[in-house]
C-alpha cells in the first residue's frame, strides 16, 4: 500500500511540475496576434514580468533604470537552470577572457554571453515585438532547439532601449491608423510629426551613443 501511495504522489508531483513549466506565447498573453498591431511599452514590460514569474528557473529580470519620462528599462537574463544558478561566475569568467579581470586565467569552455538589444530607434517598432517572441522561444519548454542553445549560452535581452520614442510613435500610429493599416509611406499614420519616434525624450539619437 505504501508503495502505491509513493508512486501516486510521484505521478502527481511530476504532472504538477510539468504543468507549471509552461509559458503563454505573446499572442496568448496580449490577446491579439503578435505583429497585427503595435504593442505599447507597458504591455511589453508586463509580458517580461509575466515570463519571469512563469519560468523563474530559467530567467532573471532587472530594472536597470528609468527613462526621462519614467518608463522602466529592463534587462532579462535567460539561461539553462544550471547556468542561471552561476551567472556571477560566468560574468567574471567573461571578464577574465577579455583581460579586464586578471586574478586567474579565463576558462574558454564556459557559456558564451549573447546580448540582444531592441528598439534603439523608437519608430522602428517591430523590434520590441520581436523581443517578446525571442523571449518566448528561449523559454518555451517545447522548443528543443533553444534548449540545446542554452546549454552553452547565456542570453541577455533589453526589449526596448528607447521606450519614450517608441511610445511616442506607437501612440501616434494607433491614433491615426484606420481599421486596415495602409502600407503606403505617404498615408497619415506613417507621417509622424516632429520630433518623431526615432529619438529619445531629449531628441537624441541613441544609436549614436548607446554602449
Task: List the model feature ranges, each with a label.
Residues 1-24:
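Bacterial Sec-dependent N-terminal signal peptides
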Residues 21-61, 68, 72:
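N-terminal hydrophobic targeting/anchoring segments and the immediately downstream early-domain regions
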Residues 32-38, 120-124, 202-211:
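The substrate-binding groove and active-site-proximal loops of carbohydrate-active enzymes
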Residues 40, 70, 119, 157, ...:
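Divalent metal-coordination and catalytic microenvironments
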Residues 49, 53-56, 135-143, 211:
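Sec-exported extracytoplasmic/periplasmic mature domains
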Residues 68, 81-83, 120-125, 161-166:
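Solvent-exposed loop/turn segments at secondary-structure junctions
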Residues 74-80, 90-95, 102-104, 108-111, ...:
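Surface-exposed loop and adjacent secondary-structure segments within mature catalytic domains
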Amino acid at each position: 500500500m505504501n508503495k502505491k501511495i509513493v508512486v501516486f504522489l510521484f505521478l502527481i508531483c511530476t504532472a504538477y511540475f510539468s504543468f507549471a513549466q509552461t509559458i503563454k506565447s505573446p499572442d496568448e498573453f496580449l490577446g491579439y496576434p503578435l505583429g497585427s498591431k503595435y504593442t505599447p511599452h507597458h504591455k511589453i514590460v508586463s509580458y517580461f514580468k509575466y515570463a519571469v514569474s512563469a519560468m523563474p528557473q530559467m530567467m532573471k529580470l532587472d530594472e536597470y533604470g528609468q527613462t526621462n519620462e519614467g518608463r522602466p528599462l529592463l534587462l532579462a537574463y535567460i539561461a539553462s537552470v544550471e547556468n542561471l544558478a552561476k551567472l556571477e561566475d560566468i560574468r567574471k569568467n567573461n571578464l577574465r577572457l577579455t583581460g579586464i579581470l586578471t586574478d586567474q586565467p579565463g576558462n574558454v569552455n564556459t557559456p558564451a554571453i549573447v546580448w540582444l538589444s531592441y528598439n534603439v530607434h523608437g519608430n522602428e517598432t517591430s523590434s520590441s515585438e520581436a523581443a517578446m517572441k525571442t523571449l518566448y522561444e528561449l523559454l518555451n519548454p517545447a522548443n528543443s532547439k533553444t534548449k540545446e542553445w542554452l546549454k552553452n549560452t547565456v542570453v541577455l535581452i533589453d526589449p526596448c532601449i528607447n521606450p519614450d520614442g517608441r511610445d511616442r510613435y506607437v501612440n501616434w500610429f494607433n491614433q491615426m491608423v484606420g481599421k486596415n493599416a495602409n502600407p503606403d509611406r505617404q498615408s497619415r499614420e506613417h507621417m509622424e510629426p516632429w520630433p518623431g519616434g526615432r529619438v529619445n525624450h531629449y531628441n537624441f539619437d541613441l544609436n549614436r551613443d548607446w554602449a
